[in-house]
């Protein structure tokens, strides 16, 4: 794995020698990577390469799979997220997740965003919660479209609006990292453009990691790109370098469409 010319001196997250197993099958093999604050990091690679599995290991979503086992070390601000003392609920508030398919709760738009802050004690009063909900919807670029519809069901929104609602839901609990697992794959081009614009706007506030099959999207939204193949991290570098001057032959073959 090549990771030359990376200057992430104070990473938000650091993975060292990470392996992920599902039963006897190894899905991730000895992956080490740093995720920087105020950067968008894209994970690319063909289907089944392990990029989504590795993403889910960054906030212990693999814990929900009975056969999954993770070894190695993953740190958030220097703290081992797999340590027995780690509060997984708090971890997932600090490292939020936006999934491939929009999955709003069967609740009102307001309650979709307000649920997390309420259970985490971030909004002691209704007035406080109103402020948190509005701020999250503004940051997600959705406030102007829904401010007069807050009591309507989140499932009544369009697909693109639902995905932005899910992003608002994630950022309402004031995370430090946002993980996005192919957030635009189920959306039309107009909705995709809005999500990409939102990613640019959020970059200065959060460390963002996005899994995408769309190499053009990775090139547009990220500053760092990691190429995965067969469960290994083949190459990690500045996005411009990965797409214009990859150091590994497998990376070049994938970027130029020879496989994938």
From Swiss-Prot:
Ranges for domain ABC transporter: 13-255
SMART domains, sorted: AAA (SM00382)
A biological process term (GO) from this entry: phosphate ion transmembrane transport
Subcellular locations according to the entry: Cell inner membrane
Chain residues that bind ATP: 45-52
Catalytic activity reported: phosphate(out) + ATP + H2O = ADP + 2 phosphate(in) + H(+)
EC number: 7.3.2.1
Sorted UniProt keywords: ATP-binding, Cell inner membrane, Cell membrane, Membrane, Nucleotide-binding, Phosphate transport, Translocase, Transport
Pfam families in the record: ABC_tran (PF00005)
Domain of life where this protein originates: Bacteria
Family annotation (CDD domains): ABC_PstB_phosphate_transporter
Main location: membrane
Membrane topology: Peripheral membrane protein
GO cellular component: plasma membrane
A molecular-function term among this protein's GO annotations: ATPase-coupled phosphate ion transmembrane transporter activity
Role noted for this protein: Part of the ABC transporter complex PstSACB involved in phosphate import. Responsible for energy coupling to the transport system.
Protein name as annotated: Phosphate import ATP-binding protein PstB
Species of the source: Sphingopyxis alaskensis (strain DSM 13593 / LMG 18877 / RB2256)
Taxonomic path: Bacteria, Pseudomonadati, Pseudomonadota, Alphaproteobacteria, Sphingomonadales
């Amino acid at each position: 794995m090549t990771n030359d010319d990376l200057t992430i001196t104070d990473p938000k997250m650091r993975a060292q020698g990470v392996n992920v197993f599902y039963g006897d099958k190894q899905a991730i093999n000895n992956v080490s990577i740093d995720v920087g604050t105020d950067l968008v990091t894209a994970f690319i690679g063909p289907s089944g390469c392990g990029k989504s599995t590795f993403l889910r290991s960054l906030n212990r979503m693999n814990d929900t799979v009975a056969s999954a086992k993770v070894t190695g070390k993953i740190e958030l601000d220097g703290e081992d997220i797999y340590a027995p003392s780690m509060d997984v609920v708090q971890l997932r508030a600090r490292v939020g997740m936006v999934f491939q398919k929009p999955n709003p709760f069967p609740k009102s738009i307001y309650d979709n965003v307000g649920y997390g802050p309420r259970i985490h004690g971030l909004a002691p009063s209704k007035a406080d919660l109103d402020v948190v909900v509005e701020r999250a919807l503004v940051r997600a670029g959705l406030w102007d479209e829904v401010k007069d519809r807050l009591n309507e069901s989140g499932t009544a929104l369009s697909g693109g609006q639902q995905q932005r609602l899910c992003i608002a839901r994630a950022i309402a609990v004031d995370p430090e990292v946002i993980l996005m697992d192919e957030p635009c794959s189920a959306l039309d081009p107009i909705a995709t453009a809005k999500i990409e614009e939102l990613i640019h706007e959020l970059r200065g506030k959060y460390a963002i990691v996005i899994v995408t099959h769309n190499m053009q999207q990775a090139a547009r939204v990220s500053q760092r790109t990691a190429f995965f193949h067969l469960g290994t991290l083949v190459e990690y570098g500045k996005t411009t370098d990965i797409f214009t001057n990859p150091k590994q032959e497998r990376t070049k073959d994938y970027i130029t469409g020879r496989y994938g």
